[in-house]
């Protein structure tokens, strides 16, 4: 079975659009883009477009790649103080000379639509869902629930330990909550016996950023696989590149119970949860 993200995301977005249309004012989302990374520019454009479609007023703030930390922090502080802005997103990755941790921590936790501020991450770890959940982990759970993939008591293996996906997803999936409550194993590229461990997993989340890393010999026939990876690889086509996931899709798709495609799997869910968090921020302010 293919776990396509678009229908699941559209269901969420349609609900948000209906709720926002009944609001006396519109939520405001500020997206900060630093530099000229082509992929980041595409992603920001997609987010701004989707926000506009459902009634969120969204504006991209573009800064040059040589921007100083001070100038970025000044912009974020201005957005923190702006009552018309309910959510702030800083598009990652940042230019190497900028400290992403310092910048993300400068965002008000109440406007942290990415859910990456230490306050929101801390609430997640403590099992407090009053905070804003990181978009990709939350989107993965919503996607699995949409396709009625049972999670309670299942063994979930997460390959990757980033602050954006791996760590918060592990914290989310292990929570004693009706939608999660998994037994979680966190792995990475240097983990010993990785193939053997993956074969015991009911659910595999691939979030390494290593194209085609997960092979068909690593998965059990009953496994549900969520591929978070999106690596641009040069290709002889109109775009000049193709997107590859962390899973060797063509060989794995016939060896597992269900799998997300790349693109069209996790990506739409991440955007949907970003919009959901923005609406939630607006409601909290109102």
UniProtKB/Swiss-Prot annotation:
Keyword NADP: yes
Keywords tagged on the record: Amino-acid biosynthesis, Histidine biosynthesis, Hydrolase, Methionine biosynthesis, Multifunctional enzyme, NADP, One-carbon metabolism, Oxidoreductase, Purine biosynthesis
Record-linked CDD domains: NAD_bind_m-THF_DH_Cyclohyd
A single MF term (Gene Ontology): methenyltetrahydrofolate cyclohydrolase activity
InterPro entries in alphabetical order: Aminoacid_DH-like_N_sf, NAD(P)-bd_dom_sf, THF_DH/CycHdrlase, THF_DH/CycHdrlase_cat_dom, THF_DH/CycHdrlase_CS, THF_DH/CycHdrlase_NAD-bd_dom
The EC number(s) this enzyme carries: 1.5.1.5, 3.5.4.9
Catalysis performed (reactions): (6R)-5,10-methylene-5,6,7,8-tetrahydrofolate + NADP(+) = (6R)-5,10-methenyltetrahydrofolate + NADPH; (6R)-5,10-methenyltetrahydrofolate + H2O = (6R)-10-formyltetrahydrofolate + H(+)
Annotated binding of NADP(+), by residue: 160-162, 189, 230
Pathway field: One-carbon metabolism; tetrahydrofolate interconversion
Function in brief: Catalyzes the oxidation of 5,10-methylenetetrahydrofolate to 5,10-methenyltetrahydrofolate and then the hydrolysis of 5,10-methenyltetrahydrofolate to 10-formyltetrahydrofolate.
Subunit structure: Homodimer.
Family: Belongs to the tetrahydrofolate dehydrogenase/cyclohydrolase family.
Protein's recorded name: Bifunctional protein FolD
Organism: Chlamydia pneumoniae
Biological classification of the source: Bacteria, Pseudomonadati, Chlamydiota, Chlamydiia, Chlamydiales
Gene name of the encoded protein: folD
